[in-house]
Amino acid sequence: GSDGFVTQTNDDQTGTVMRFRDMIDGTSNVIALGEKRLDDRSLGNYQGDDNEGYTSGWDHDVIRFTNVQPRVDSNNGGWGEQRFGSIHSQMFNALFADGSVRPISYDIDGNLFSLLGRRNDGQAVSPP
């Protein structure tokens, strides 16, 4: 995407820098990183979204999206579905752009969660 804390650029945008001042929503309203949902039955084996290291770049192993509801880890033999999530039964931890770490409930309103993944939508939110 092009409106999150981490953005993908085209070849003609090489060298483009996103600055904190570009986060018009405020750094306390933007998720920078978070735990990722996995299939715990497949840990140590191939999982399509957990088979590369963290340095693999723009890859579905390291990218998660806020346009899908976060979920607790699964044990059904599937992938993590590129969702945020964790083994915690009620929430996952997210690092916000201001440096704070906050728990995010799996029951978070979908619209609010989506807005927390955008740095420049201009929407006022009250993060959890």
Segments from the language model and where they lie:
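Surface-exposed loop/linker segments characteristic of extracytoplasmic
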Residues: 1-128
